[in-house]
Amino acid sequence: ELFKNINLNLGHEEKIAIIGSNGSGKSTLLKIIAGLISPSEGYMEIFHNKIDSLDDFKKFRNDIAYLPQDVTNHFLCPTVIEDVIFSLRAKGVSKEEALIQGSEILEELKITHLKDRIIFDLSGGEQKIVALAGLLILKPKILLLDEPTNALDEQSEKRIIEILNSIKKSMIIVSHHRSFIDSLTSTVYRLDGKFTRL
């Protein structure tokens, strides 16, 4: 087993970081919290509701947004604006309203200039921000971020830090870059068999 007896309380608009060696289970833990996989045993509580199975998780699906380490398989549409509004359109929001909300998110993240660009022509950092925009448009209460600056250059990392510090959301961030973590939060846990607050 990768880990057991993990207790993690996430407050309103609190940012928590999890560090640990490769293979320690950081990404697996994030996927469990995101409702993508089930723990082999035990349960989770979300907003004081006990979650025993993935079926129990369904009603909280819109409250929790997960950004994977590799976002290249995350995109469903060719252009930035089409992809950012895709989830709203899938929920039945009119194209006109979705475009208004999409434009607001792009402006908030300062990427309006990318609106009509083909996603796969963008840099890795730009793709991460576009993927983040696609999550934020759904107004989740919790963001789960798996290595959000992995393989990014220094300038892109600074931009991600700036964005994450401006977002008023509860977040759990997995990263092995301690300097990145320290620029976001002082609440840091290490997962290496045991789960320890540093």
Where are these regions (language model features)?
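Helix-to-loop junction immediately C-terminal to a conserved catalytic motif
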Residues: 34
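Conserved ABC ATPase "signature" region
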Residues: 96-114
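Conserved ABC ATPase signature
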Residues: 118-122, 126
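Catalytic Walker B motif of ABC-type/P-loop ATPase nucleotide-binding domains
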Residues: 143-146
